Amino acid sequence: MKASSDSKGDIVSPYSSGPIENETRGECHPISAKGGQPEKENKVSLELTEEIIQSMEVGMAVRDYSGRISSMDFHRTSTYLVTASADESIRLYDVANATCLKTINSKKYGVDLVCFTSHPTTVIYSSKNGWDESLRLLSLNDNKYLRYFKGHHDRVVSVCLCCRQECFISGSLDRTVLLWDQRADKCQGLLHVQGRPATAYDDQGLVFAVAFDGCIRMFDARSYEKGPFEIFSVGGDMSDVNVVKFSNDGRLMLLTTKDGHIYVLDSFRGTRLATFNVKPVLSDATLEASFSPEGMFVISGSGDGNVYAWSVRSGKEVRLANFVL
């Protein structure tokens, strides 16, 4: 889940100096390509219930940054977490060991959004300097840019990778959505939109969604040039869309807006199943919300600095009594 919180915790990680490559400076512990996981892993199946949600506590806190966290992403198969901060840094953490593995500074370009590729030590990130809106494919192992993706002409506000293929999608305030292949410099597709776009792939990589102006447009990834095959409305809410996401099983979608609304929809019929409300975030921040792994709960940040959770089935808030920021 990405976040817009500037709250700070109580663990400061030690660093050792690293090399300078392509303007990014790194300080790190050695990085394992396996993402900190042992070769043989014992996995436990756990049914997530309201009682378990209510009993959750903060397990790791960090304060090794000097600006608001603008974006963060968990790797799908490793124990790694990557963050982007307003202090123009990218940080890689191993959450299983509560360790910061690497800090990379991007003073020249700034950093706004960041997300993992399929590899746990490679990320794609967007700039925040106001003059270069390129996306960059960065190796965290050696702090080297592997590829630049040029095409947007204003701030990139949405980036989503396809977990099944080496492709991703980005949306910008220049009112374009671009489709990319990580192996190519030039975009593979272009869509013009009429507002601030939010983008998302489903878990199978067969469908992607583009949301703006109170509607979610559904595209077949194999024939997107034909236009959307479905358009879902969230009921007249025309405020700027912040994020759109699919649940892991693809059955549900959520959409957040600048005004603090969170909508949950059936991704097949477009039926609105629930609406949750939080205090709006700052004008330059993003209201981020996510489904729990099985899709039964929604967890979101808020402009009041708190984290909230709701049951999708009942629509009721699940109190996070032990979750104090």
Predicted segments, located by residue:
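WD40-repeat beta-propeller superdomains and closely related acidic/aromatic-rich repeat-like regions
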Residues: 2-325
